[in-house]
């Protein structure tokens, strides 16, 4: 007789559509989305990897403190850097242009800090991981830089570019997790969830059974 598997509700501590879509790829649907609004300013001399894991931890803790029910909270933060220099999350076309110039013809690194908290009976169990992917862009012409910086896709993206968009045409080399570049390393996410007791099951509301027959609505953002 098969054991009925009941997973805890999964809360995504991010309003990122990309992270929702990435979870969809591995057939996981967050029960709820609660964006964690925190100060993401790097500390003095803070390096990219420690920054990413610190921000992921702060996001997870903030959301965990806001909920009362037993849940699994997934939080992540992605940081792009050239050497030790952290590139901003571009908010203007000029920032996009600055970032693209910085990575043109150079290897750069994308770090995603992952923090997953299992909150059960007011006890917190943590899983944390920092994942690094190395990317190299070809040497871009002024025309390519100007064209890309005129697009919307780099706005609000770490490092001023969207790897799954037009910027993919610039990539000559990738070493590491592709999903990490997009904001959530899926291999590490599933491993962490599994270690906290999550299981795939046809009885589980957090998992798609059959996309062709189950039309499940996307979670709402709180």
Curated annotation (Swiss-Prot):
Keywords (A to Z) from UniProt: Cytoplasm, Hydrolase, Nucleotide metabolism
Cofactor(s) demanded: a divalent metal cation
Reactions catalysed, as given in the entry: a ribonucleoside 5'-triphosphate + H2O = a ribonucleoside 5'-phosphate + diphosphate + H(+); a 2'-deoxyribonucleoside 5'-triphosphate + H2O = a 2'-deoxyribonucleoside 5'-phosphate + diphosphate + H(+)
Principal cellular location given in the protein's record: cytoplasm
GO MF annotation, one: nucleoside triphosphate diphosphatase activity
Function: Nucleoside triphosphate pyrophosphatase. May have a dual role in cell division arrest and in preventing the incorporation of modified nucleotides into cellular nucleic acids.
Name used for this protein in its record: Nucleoside triphosphate pyrophosphatase
Phylogenetic lineage: Bacteria, Pseudomonadati, Pseudomonadota, Alphaproteobacteria, Rickettsiales
